[in-house]
Amino acid sequence: FVNASQLTDATFQTAINDILAQDPNGDYDLSPYGKIQDWDVSQVTNMSNAFFNKSSFNGDISAWDTSSVTNMNTMFRDASVFNQNLNSWDVSSVTNMFSMFRDASVFNGDITSWNTGSVTGMGDMFYDANSFNQDIGSWDVSSVTKMNQMFRSSSIFNQDIGSWDTSSVTNMVGMFYGAGSFNQDISSWDTSNVFTMQYMFLGANLFNQPLDSWDVSSVFSFESMFQDANVFNQDLNSWNTSSATQMKSIFYKARDFNGNISSWDVSNITDMSKMFRQAFDFNQDISSWDTSNVTRMYETFYDARVFNQDIGSWDVSGVNFMQSMFNGANDFDGDITSWDVSSVTSMAFMFQFSPFNQDISGWDVSSVGT
């Protein structure tokens, strides 16, 4: 036999491929490297893709010495039957855990005690890990910069991670997208360095926790942040949204949302399309909003069934698209007669299925094509 201590970055992946070709769990006495559970991997630094798409692997590798490993990117992605206890692993040198358990659909191994203090990337880590629900609240995530899609479609995860130090995180895109069970208090998170929160709670059907203390002053995109977050209904009025340029679909299908957002600074927003579409309960005073930079308002209040606030003072002079803006807005009959719509090119179905009955004969619609 080749001495297992000779496994290095150069031989590690070849050894895995060879032994799993003989036995799906690496329990093969005649392997030149010995049984997989006995391997000495102490010299290996890169374990990225190690068991990627190894759909039959469920070997016991709990005794591996992983103290030299820095990269575990995609290590168990699509390892669809893997479910072992890895809590004894030394991951203190690992910096990259991107997609580590993505699509590892039955994995719920104990990893609660991992020292993750060196990790900077956890994006996609538990994406579609539909069985994972371990208590990882004590993890040190203070160095992590990317948590994008970390728990996306992780359908049963609902652990207390409210004490995490997220002060280094810049990217939270889709972090809880489709995390249908998650409803934990994360109000104390430091989000001051996060620049994008788009899709963050999209489809997080049970999430309804206070977020008013979050510092979102660096966020430029809130696109679809609470889309399909059916029960979310919190006061967000304290948010500093002055850096944001994108709010498309932020409350689309957030059916219970009626939180106070009257003081939001939307002066840099360019896209408000579908912003309150099917936000059935929304009826807050947003009359003072500075909409002077908005160019897209199509479907903004589409099917916003109870909205009927005074938005007559809005500056819509830069808006190009207003199609279906109030379509199905069952209560809206606000006075918007003074709006400057001279830049609008599309107004199709703007007031369809709404009771709107104001005299807008003075509108300049010379640019409207549809």
For the regions a language model picked out, list residue spans one by one.
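Negatively charged
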Residues: 1-370
